[in-house]
Amino acid sequence: MEFQIINDLKIKNLNMVVLSKDGDIIDNQKLTFDNEKINVTLEYKEGISIYFEKGKIKTETVVLSPLIEILKIRYNKNNKLYTIDYLLKKDSYGKVTTYTLSDDKNLWYREDKKKNIYVWTPSNFSKKKQYKLMICFDGQNIFDTTKVGEYTKNHDIYGSWQIETTIEAFNKNHEDDYIVVGIDNADIYRDSELTLNMKLTDFVELAQVEFAHCFEDGKEMYFECFSNFIKETLLPFIKSKYNLKEEKLTVVGSSSGGEASFYFGLQNMELVERIFCFSSATATIKPKVFLRTLKKLKIKRNKKILPELFIFQGGTGELESLLAMGNEYLVPLLKHYGYDENKISYLYQKDSDHNEDSWKYAFNYFISLIDDNK
């Protein structure tokens, strides 16, 4: 594969370290920047990743995919990390439109009974063309505001998933084009909307502390209500506004959003064809309760309609390391309960932390594996 590197650090020499899918170093190249841009060629193998370093400077480690055209190395002043953005050769990234949806029935617990959603359409969008639908449970952080404009005030210091960049590249090379709906989940109801309806004692001890606020003053988890909002309000609204293919949708999420995508997808297999589940908070549930929950999903009974599962897990940082220990058995358990291993793609990166920088490259990598003919 060939891609361009833009060096925004104003450093003439950098080492580019290439890792195998298992994390072993397979190449180490010294790059010399006579100007800020150079072209690099690598032998692409599925799951390879790279990072750049010189002395005390070391960037994040990012997994590569054939969709990547340009990587930009920069220093992020907000989180004080050396980060890597990716760009397209054409400066066109589509458009985001914001809608506010009301639902008195399912969003009864919210003071205003409303949710903001952000709908991204590609740069070549046409009302005459039919599109597949992707729903993301972390809507406030999935699009890069420098490319699609300001659409939310709830930004994260780690930036965005840059989904607009990935899907633009994906749509160029695939028959099926996507539009993307992001659901804003950055307010006080994030945990209660994205976490299964359970008792506080069903969670592991650390999670009980984290989720205690969800149960104050008679409150509870609202995942079932939130799921019904998607099915009964969001989906009909999107179908009325956009020309969608009459096919199943894709759901995407990380952390609590990863847990939501996992359970929403497996509880609604008749609606969902693909699940992207990153750094999932499924590990916050006690093992016995989790096993009981998996059994209720009736995986064996629904073998013919099981969604494709794309599971990512990092291993760096306090939170990500804890989730990694809990999620270590997720794939083996799914297989034990009858999940077709050919429908599960799994990537573990020990150097990846619990943030958008990690998830944007995991998403880019996984979506490059999609086969339109499946």
Each model region followed by its residue ranges:
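Short, aromatic- and glycine-rich surface loops/edge beta-strands on solvent-exposed regions
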Residues: 46-55, 73
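Extracellular beta-sheet/turn segments enriched in Thr/Pro/Gly and aliphatic residues
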Residues: 60-90
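Non-catalytic cap/lid and distal C-terminal segments of serine-dependent acyl enzymes
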Residues: 50, 86-374
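Short Pro-Gly-centered beta-turn/loop motif in secreted/extracellular proteins
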Residues: 35-50, 62-67
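Beta-strand-rich interaction surfaces with strong enrichment in secreted/lumenal proteins
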Residues: 28-29, 60-62, 105-107
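Structural motif
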Residues: 3-23
